[in-house]
Amino acid sequence: TKSILILPSALMIQSAVGQCLGRWGPGLGRCGGCGGCDGWGGRLGYGAGIGEIGLGCGLEASYGGGLGVASASAVPPVGLGVASENMYEGCVGVAGNLPFLGTAGVEGVFPTAGAGVINYGCGDGAVGITSEGGYGGLGYGGLGYEGVGGYGLGYGGYGLGGCGCGCGRYL
């Protein structure tokens, strides 16, 4: 009974490590480092063809790391605030992008010799919507994840993927 619990646990942990590493891990995922999944030795397009160290696919927004929002309330936060309580002297320029719609404001005491200004622009027409790459068809060949033509012509073919030696399509 121990092996019934330990073996699936080990497989789940290895799968999770493969998912976290994506394409860049040292061969800890589904098929290991050098060589292919099923003895074909890479570049033959018989596998999933996306690095083979854990399926390195998913939504693009998940790769940049998240902007952590912490709340001590039982109700989830409905807004996001970026605040600074530092004192700045001289010219200060801040640039960047915040997710979703928002407002900008300056609070605090400004000395009579200084000035505070906010220049705020909103969006490029894609307000609150991100264009993300999604998952493929997850089929085996044909028009699925292996691409048009099955073996060797889709993501798993020469030059675009294959089982590789731990770096997927980059080798």
From Swiss-Prot:
Which residue intervals make up region (Central domain)?
62-132
Signal peptide as annotated in the record: 1-18
Query: What GO molecular-function term can you cite, just one?
Result: structural constituent of egg chorion
Provide this UniProt record's keywords sorted from A to Z.
Answer: Repeat, Signal
Among the Pfam families in the record, one is Chorion_1
Gene Ontology CC entries for this record: egg chorion
Cystines in this chain: none
Keyword Zinc tagged:
no
Write out the similarity annotation: Belongs to the chorion protein family.
Its name, as the record gives it, is Chorion class B protein PC401
What organism is the protein native to?
A: Antheraea polyphemus (Polyphemus moth)
Instruction: Recite the lineage of the species.
Output: Eukaryota, Metazoa, Ecdysozoa, Arthropoda, Hexapoda
